[in-house]
């Protein structure tokens, strides 16, 4: 039985309605994912303790460093599929879908091997405190055993979003989130499995979401239907996908590596700092919900409209998406600024842990609009086929500048707040660069020669 075709042609109709109708399911899906990630940390922090919380809550930067490059590759696949879908070239859509999945299988196996074998080395390089190291190694190794499922889900989700279907991934995230929370309570709360239970619960939930996404694609009646026997490489399309995806992957890796350097400096302040900053990172994740929602909407919208030659419509959509993302991110930032003490106590009641999380919130929260602007322009440029521009901007501002600032500033002001200021400073500088390029460059006609 064929699944309901929920793809959306974003080249017609009200720009505002198309953008919001796409972004809202992405927002809700990411909200579910962020909630279960947060509940993961809350359960570990309450049932196991602050050392375990430090291991789990501070995991985001390392996980993103290991997975970010691969996720970027599948952003490239989504861009290519969106462009062909907008141009009504459905034969290319079919070929790109099967190339995407063949690539995902290879990347998933590679990431699993890298995560399992290199986790101890990376955690040692990150100067993880001795009282947290063994727990962190156990958590990460178990987590990375689910890498194949994570990659396959992201590949499938990217395909669905590229053709305008943001609702199906929402349903799958709701289901997997419920599975994760239930298993957390069972494994960590009832069975006392500690961080191992949290990791196993996460892996199982990732497998559930991947299976649901694959079933959806194999039962679709649209041009993006997945046929298992047709999975294989179309080399010209693989080259096109990687030409779009590698810059996005490198951009993710740049951000992740810089953040791992930040985390390694935080680790030198001890497990209280790790737990406090880890708690903050979980709360900060809610800020990324509107940003990510409009980033996904912008990438699909710009890709489809430029693929269809709707250049003025693409410009209007870019403005609407970026402004909405900035407004929502800043609203959440203001709320976090005032509610930080209450938010941090959800994870752990230790006064030292709470104080560090609150301090980071008060330094960074009011600058979230700059973060949203940078990600919004990046999404527009990727959708327009100019993924190299955000890659180089992030390399200069979010990697080289951020790491240089921390390295030099800590020698003058050896305080953890010095580290926290790295983010607002580098977000602001990148915004200036992006604004100049966005206003001056003719990014909107980048695809005319390739489609």
Residues covered by each model-derived region:
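Helix-terminus/linker motif at the lipid-water interface of multi-pass membrane proteins
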Residues: 35-54, 123-130, 186-193, 253-286, ...
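Small-residue-rich hydrophobic transmembrane alpha-helices
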Residues: 53-113, 117, 150-169, 263, ...
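Short alpha-helical transmembrane segments in multi-pass integral membrane proteins
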Residues: 1-23, 81-148, 190-246, 302-367, ...
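Hydrophobic transmembrane alpha-helices of multi-pass small-molecule transporters
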Residues: 65-68, 180-184, 210-214, 286-289, ...
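Short runs within selected transmembrane alpha-helices of multi-pass transporters and secretion channels
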Residues: 74, 142-161, 169-177, 198-213, ...
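Transmembrane helical elements of multi-pass membrane transporters/channels
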Residues: 21-40, 142, 153, 176, ...
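Small-residue hotspots at the loop-to-helix junctions and early N-terminal turns
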Residues: 48-61, 136, 140, 199, ...
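Residue-level signal for short hydrophobic patches within transmembrane helices
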Residues: 16-35, 39, 62-69, 145, ...
């Amino acid at each position: 039985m064929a699944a309901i075709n929920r793809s959306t042609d974003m080249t017609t109709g009200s720009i505002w309605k198309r953008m919001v109708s796409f972004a809202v399911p992405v927002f809700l899906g990411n909200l579910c994912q962020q909630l279960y990630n947060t509940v993961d940390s809350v359960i570990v922090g309450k049932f196991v303790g602050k050392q375990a919380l430090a291991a789990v809550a501070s995991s985001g930067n390392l996980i993103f460093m290991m997975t970010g490059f691969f996720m970027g590759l599948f952003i490239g696949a989504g861009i290519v599929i969106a462009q062909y879908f907008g141009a009504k070239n459905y034969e290319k859509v079919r070929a790109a879908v099967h190339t995407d999945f063949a690539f995902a299988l290879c990347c998933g196996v590679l990431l699993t091997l890298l995560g399992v074998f290199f986790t101890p080395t990376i955690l040692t390089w990150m100067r993880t405190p001795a009282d947290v190291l063994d727990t962190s190694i156990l958590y990460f190794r178990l987590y990375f055993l689910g890498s194949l499922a994570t990659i396959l889900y992201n590949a499938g989700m990217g395909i669905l979003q590229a053709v305008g279907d943001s609702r199906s991934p929402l349903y799958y995230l709701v289901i997997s989130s419920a599975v994760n929370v239930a298993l957390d309570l069972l494994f960590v709360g009832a069975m006392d499995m500690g961080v191992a239970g949290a990791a196993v619960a996460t892996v199982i939930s990732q497998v559930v979401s991947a299976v649901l996404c694959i079933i959806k694609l194999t039962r679709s009646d649209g041009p993006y239907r997945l046929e298992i026997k047709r999975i294989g490489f179309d080399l010209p399309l693989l080259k096109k996908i990687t030409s779009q995806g590698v810059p996005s992957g490198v951009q993710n890796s740049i951000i992740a590596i810089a953040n791992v350097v930040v985390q390694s400096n935080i680790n030198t302040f001890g497990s209280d700092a790790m737990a406090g900053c880890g708690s903050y990172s979980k709360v900060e994740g809610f800020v990324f919900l509107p940003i990510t929602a409009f980033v996904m909407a912008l990438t699909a919208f710009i890709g489809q409209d430029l693929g269809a030659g709707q250049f003025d419509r693409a410009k209007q959509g870019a403005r609407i998406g970026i402004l909405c993302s900035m407004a929502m991110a800043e609203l959440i930032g203001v709320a976090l600024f005032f509610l930080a003490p209450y938010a941090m106590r959800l994870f752990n009641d230790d006064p030292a842990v709470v104080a560090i999380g609150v301090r980071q919130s008060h330094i960074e929260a009011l600058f979230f609009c700059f973060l949203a602007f940078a990600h919004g322009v990046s999404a527009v440029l990727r959708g327009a086929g100019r993924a190299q521009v955000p890659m180089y901007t992030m390399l200069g501002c979010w990697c080289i500048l951020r790491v240089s600032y921390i390295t030099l500033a800590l020698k003058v002001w050896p305080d953890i707040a010095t580290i926290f200021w790295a983010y607002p400073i580098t977000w602001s500088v990148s915004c200036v660069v992006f604004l100049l390029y966005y206003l001056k460059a003719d990014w909107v006609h980048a695809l005319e020669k390739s489609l």
